[in-house]
């Protein structure tokens, strides 16, 4: 970005000193007139002994013109893709170069909604003086604040009118963004069980295999590093949600939320057993089937075997 700004300033300086396009053409015309007055022999010798100065200058001019891409000449979708890789600081610098594009409200609206998929303010009439560029800066500032102190971050969003003071709205905001630090988010959800309840209901596990659904769940709601009450709460909530999303499958397999709870715990223990380098004697498929069916009766042996194969081939469910 710094190189691009330097290039713009340098081009302006060259134009002031007479090195713009008009200056270049006038000097080039003088050189060509002088070259035509040279003798055929000396000119031929010059061309053979060195580089064609006209070709060199023409190549240099074309390179200078092509050295910096004008985003206004690109399709809006491609421009949006390029600028979506920039953070707030770089976008501010970009606005100095691409002022019209960087101040486009549609661009900032797209950046806001692609990074923070849900905000309460999206569904409200915008207040006087509202701009998506300003909103992007506030969302970025609020995310950084959350990653330092979750409660202060949520309060910041509410003070700016970005989020309503509602567990459901906070849960939707968390579900639709990946800018929040997962360790801070885990602490926040452990303290705000009302937000956790609404966050769980946003997941749709319909027609998903149990281990894959559990992986998706733990990608959004990270599991604690140690066993305890919070992990039990997460598995309990997941089990009820999984059964609610797959009622036909539960009837077919004869599974209840309690049985799914047992299977989830078995999958977590199996994941640790198969992936930990400290465990020398890995659990076999036969042992897993026997232990699981002992804890949860009336479960198909083939179904439990497929659970083992999934962990063995794909890996940890809570990594």
Swiss-Prot record:
Keywords: Guanine-nucleotide releasing factor. Residues 68-111 form the F-box domain. Residues 146-276 form the SEC7 domain. GO terms for molecular function: guanyl-nucleotide exchange factor activity. This is F-box only protein 8. SMART domains: Sec7. One of its GO terms (cellular component) is ubiquitin ligase complex. One of its GO terms (biological process) is ubiquitin-dependent protein catabolic process.
